[in-house]
């Protein structure tokens, strides 16, 4: 997939990986490749309008990827999305792919998120998948930058801040299309069992 000039990306770095013994999720290696390198590698190939990783200074970001962080840190994924969108500074009509760094199966969803084009009344498209029951994956989606900016500003106006606010609570108000993906595509990494599952698939 050639990079599209109308597509940008935000990679949300995730928390401290408490259930993984405090490991830095972006630096977790699967198949000899760090998660941040694997995920950003997919996005850089598709997103010509820029890619930003919301990660602390301790994480080395791949070449061609910007870095930002919510202030203060550890504000949760919605605060990370807000920081990432501000760092990108893209026009309202740009499409912004939003993903978590612990999504090594991302390559299986990006084409379905970007094609076909969004409908005229749609504000974005998210993946639906999971095990045992599929559910909306707001951290595996593409959003119109203007709609994302508006809904975040509305949340700040209503709540005072998006720090610690759930992603689903805010983004579900958008007019979103949904595309089904295999459960494996959106399996994230929260536990040692998840790490072992991905290592069996990709190697250590």
Descriptions of predicted regions:
Residues 2-164, 169-185, 193, 203:
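Nucleotide and nucleotide-moiety/phosphate-recognizing core
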């Amino acid at each position: 997939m050639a990079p599209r000039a109308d597509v940008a990306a935000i990679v949300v770095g995730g928390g401290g990986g408490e259930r993984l013994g405090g490991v830095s999720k972006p630096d977790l290696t699967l198949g000899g490749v760090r998660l941040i390198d694997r995920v950003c590698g997919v996005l850089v190939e598709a997103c010509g309008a820029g890619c930003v990783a919301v990660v602390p200074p301790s994480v080395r970001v791949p070449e061609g990827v910007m870095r930002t962080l919510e202030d203060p840190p550890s504000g949760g994924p919605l605060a990370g999305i807000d920081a990432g969108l501000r760092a990108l500074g893209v026009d309202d009509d740009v499409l912004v792919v939003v993903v978590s760094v612990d999504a090594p199966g991302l390559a299986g969803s990006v084409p379905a998120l970007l094609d076909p084009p969004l409908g005229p009344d749609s504000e974005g498209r998210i993946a639906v998948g999971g095990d045992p029951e599929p559910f909306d994956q707001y951290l595996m989606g593409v959003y119109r930058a203007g709609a994302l900016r508006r809904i975040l500003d509305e949340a700040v106006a209503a709540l005072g801040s998006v720090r610690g606010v759930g992603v689903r609570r805010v983004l579900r108000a958008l007019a979103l299309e949904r595309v089904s993906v295999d459960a494996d595509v959106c399996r994230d990494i929260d536990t040692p069992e998840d790490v072992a599952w991905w290592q069996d698939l990709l190697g250590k």
